[in-house]
Amino acid sequence: LSGATMAAGLVAWFGAKGVKRVVERDRPLGYLPDVVIREGDGSGLGYVSGHSAVAATAAVMAMAALPARWRPVPAVVAFLVGIARVVHGVHLPADLVGGWSLGVLIAFAALWLVDRLDRAGTAA
């Protein structure tokens, strides 16, 4: 599952970059000139948050491998990664929702693919 997690994380990162190019929405500085930027220069495209997408992907993949009592931990970490992006002034809340959604979708697709490959290997 670790290899699938790495691959899914890369797909999430590059998927977020692709969505940014299609949507072409600025970061908060483009809409809120008084925003305080705590990281970088606030330039570039904002929707979706790549950090949130990768964090959500990693969280879902980890949740699939963890015992039930530990599953909330990666979800909380992914949530906090997104919140940090808003606090740093580099994303709007909608960017986080988009990133988390993309990440969860990619993780579910990766888990489905891993399951299919495992079943195919068992049947062979």
Residue ranges: model-predicted function:
Residues 1-15:
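Interfacial segments of alpha-helical transmembrane regions
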Residues 2-3, 20, 71:
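Short, surface-exposed helix-loop/turn micro-motifs enriched in polar/charged residues
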